[in-house]
């Protein structure tokens, strides 16, 4: 089970709702993924205007927990305003804090992310900050009282997978809240690797929506995450420099 604040989820896959070719593909991919948490950018929708396109209009949202994110924010104050807008519309008061500090890499601004998280915690939000793989920053966010840490595997939408597994593993080892690997996942193998490292979940979007067959990829990601989690719980064998025979040598007859 994945526990975030007061919520408990069976699925460890969190799925973004953007960039799908059409609403029908989006809906089918979400259903196949069995994700229970759907994230979306508040700025991409006019959530107070029923006449405007709505990324969630073809989804039976009562079956899901919605995770609005503050994508587009460049400052802590902007992030807080976006989060409050989502909450005022009646959406879940759980929010993914995203404050971008660089337009080319889309890497998060560590100072503004820390500030926004603190402000939103004071407002009573359930806070899930998207951050880099900075181990110290992850610890400082945890000390603030955030409800989960969301370190990026690599830049958003890059599909590079986990470029710094050592830092991700350090973040996981020191964590007392769930660690959800976010951004840069490109394949089921990437998702499985994140889970093998001990992550509590994986959030992805482009890897599914940008695939040749998003529906098949959604299922593949679900299975990859499940396999990776089972592997982590089972415990992999230790790496060794030399071979170890898998068949016992004792009792073997010697052929003259």
UniProtKB/Swiss-Prot annotation:
Pathway: Cofactor biosynthesis; thiamine diphosphate biosynthesis. The keyword Transferase applies. Keywords: Cytoplasm, Schiff base, Thiamine biosynthesis, Transferase. Transmembrane segments: none annotated. Gene3D superfamilies: Aldolase class I (3.20.20.70). 1-deoxy-D-xylulose 5-phosphate binds at residues 157, 183-184, 205-206. One of its GO terms (molecular function) is thiazole synthase activity. One of its GO terms (cellular component) is cytoplasm. Pfam families: ThiG. Its EC number is 2.8.1.10. GO terms for biological process: thiamine diphosphate biosynthetic process. It is found in: Cytoplasm. Its main location: cytoplasm. It is an enzyme of class 2 (transferase). The active site is at residue 96. It catalyses: [ThiS sulfur-carrier protein]-C-terminal-Gly-aminoethanethioate + 2-iminoacetate + 1-deoxy-D-xylulose 5-phosphate = [ThiS sulfur-carrier protein]-C-terminal Gly-Gly + 2-[(2R,5Z)-2-carboxy-4-methylthiazol-5(2H)-ylidene]ethyl phosphate + 2 H2O + H(+). Homotetramer. Forms heterodimers with either ThiH or ThiS. Belongs to the ThiG family. Catalyzes the rearrangement of 1-deoxy-D-xylulose 5-phosphate (DXP) to produce the thiazole phosphate moiety of thiamine. Sulfur is provided by the thiocarboxylate moiety of the carrier protein ThiS. In vitro, sulfur can be provided by H(2)S. This is Thiazole synthase.
